[in-house]
Regions:
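Iron-sulfur (Fe-S) cluster-binding segments and ferredoxin-like electron-carrier domains
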Residues: 49, 88-107
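Short, thiol/selenol-centered motifs that function as redox-active sites or metal-ligating centers
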Residues: 74-94
Length: 124
């Protein structure tokens, strides 16, 4: 069977199914420019969707010493290490949207030696 013929076991819900989760999903609309199908699928279980969204909001919050850009770069590298193409696509998109310098995106795999990365970024 070709991968294109595989259907999901659970279909994503329409974006406006649950007003509370739809409100929380605005985080992804701001971060990625869209709400991922994984979140729309989680909406079948609103408590799970809410917990997932709140976790993402807490981790990626724009406060503290770690910049939003660096958080997204770390997420991208982590996604690559685990082999999750779905997460790779979302984290690199978020890094772009959070104004990560193109030089860093182009040289992410040389972060330990490339001059565009600071010592703090190398440690992260």
């Amino acid at each position: 069977m070709h991968w294109k013929n595989i259907m999901p076991l659970v279909n994503p819900l329409p974006k406006n199914t649950n007003s509370e989760i739809t409100e929380l999903a605005k985080f992804f609309n701001e971060t990625l420019g869209f709400c991922p199908n994984s979140v729309l699928t989680m909406m079948h279980r609103p408590k799970i969707a809410k917990a997932f969204i709140n976790l993402n909001m807490a981790v990626m919050e724009n406060q503290g010493r770690v910049t939003s850009s660096l958080k997204r770069l770390v997420a991208y590298v982590s996604s690559n290490v685990t082999g999750c193409r779905y997460c790779q696509a979302h984290t690199i998109r978020a890094a772009e949207r959070f104004s990560t310098e193109q030089e860093k995106l182009d040289h992410i795999w040389n972060y330990q030696t490339h001059p565009s990365f600071s010592e703090a970024e190398r440690v992260a």
